[in-house]
């Protein structure tokens, strides 16, 4: 026998995505590809797409958490752009980050200037003073 063939060779391990290795849901491979194709720099390190995917996943989870709370407050089970708008504008840090962003169909925050509200009557205070 010539010793060739497939006996005794190591079986190739099952492929594991970089996202699963990092414990992320966002696609590390796709982020890496987009960083390379985007002409941001000549070279892209191995850790950069993992870090960026983790940051994007965290921000998305944070916004969806707050939007889900806004939807629940409005007794709705589906998140709509209005809920995203309320979630972002009511959170100080997210509002600062996304200050210049317009959300389609988001509406505005309910706000009435204090000057426009009806004045409280002070009839009982004057009666006590006399």
UniProtKB/Swiss-Prot annotation:
Subcellular location: Nucleus; Chromosome
Residues bearing the modification N6-acetyllysine: 6
Post-translational modification: Deiminated on Arg-4 in granulocytes upon calcium entry. Monoubiquitination of Lys-120 (H2AK119Ub) by RING1, TRIM37 and RNF2/RING2 complex gives a specific tag for epigenetic transcriptional repression and participates in X chromosome inactivation of female mammals. It is involved in the initiation of both imprinted and random X inactivation. Ubiquitinated H2A is enriched in inactive X chromosome chromatin. Ubiquitination of H2A functions downstream of methylation of 'Lys-27' of histone H3 (H3K27me). H2AK119Ub by RNF2/RING2 can also be induced by ultraviolet and may be involved in DNA repair.
Any one GO CC term of the record: extracellular exosome
InterPro entries cross-referenced by the UniProt entry: Histone-fold (IPR009072), Histone_H2A (IPR002119), Histone_H2A/H2B/H3 (IPR007125), Histone_H2A_C (IPR032454), Histone_H2A_CS (IPR032458)
Keyword Repeat: no
Region (Disordered): 1-22
Crosslink feature (Glycyl lysine isopeptide (Lys-Gly) (interchain with G-Cter in ubiquitin)) location: 14, 16, 120
Modified positions (Symmetric dimethylarginine) in chain numbering: 4
Residues with N6-crotonyllysine modification: 37, 119-120, 126
GO function terms (MF aspect): DNA binding; protein heterodimerization activity; structural constituent of chromatin
Sites bearing Citrulline, chain numbering: 4
Any single biological process term in GO: heterochromatin formation
Modified residues (Phosphoserine): 2
Feature: compositional bias, Basic residues: 7-19
UniProt keyword annotations, A-Z: Acetylation, Chromosome, Citrullination, DNA-binding, Hydroxylation, Isopeptide bond, Methylation, Nucleosome core, Nucleus, Phosphoprotein, Ubl conjugation
Modified-residue entries (N6-(beta-hydroxybutyryl)lysine), positions: 10, 14, 37, 96, 119
Chain positions with N6-succinyllysine modification: 10, 96
Modified residues (N6-lactoyllysine): 10
Subunit structure and binding partners: The nucleosome is a histone octamer containing two molecules each of H2A, H2B, H3 and H4 assembled in one H3-H4 heterotetramer and two H2A-H2B heterodimers. The octamer wraps approximately 147 bp of DNA.
Described purpose of this protein according to its UniProt entry: Core component of nucleosome. Nucleosomes wrap and compact DNA into chromatin, limiting DNA accessibility to the cellular machineries which require DNA as a template. Histones thereby play a central role in transcription regulation, DNA repair, DNA replication and chromosomal stability. DNA accessibility is regulated via a complex set of post-translational modifications of histones, also called histone code, and nucleosome remodeling.
Identification of the protein by name: Histone H2A type 1-D
């Amino acid at each position: 026998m010539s010793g060739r063939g497939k006996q005794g060779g190591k079986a190739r391990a099952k492929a594991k995505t970089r996202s699963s290795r990092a414990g992320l849901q966002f696609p590390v491979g796709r982020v890496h590809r987009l960083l390379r194709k985007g002409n941001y720099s000549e070279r892209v390190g191995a850790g950069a797409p993992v870090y960026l995917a983790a940051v994007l996943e965290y921000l998305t989870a944070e916004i969806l958490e707050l939007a889900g709370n806004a939807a629940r407050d409005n007794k709705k089970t589906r998140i709509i752009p209005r809920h995203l708008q309320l979630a972002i504008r009511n959170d100080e840090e997210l509002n600062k980050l996304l200050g210049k962003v317009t959300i389609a169909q988001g509406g505005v925050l309910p706000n009435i200037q204090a000057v426009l509200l009806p004045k409280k009557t002070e009839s009982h205070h004057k009666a006590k003073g006399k």
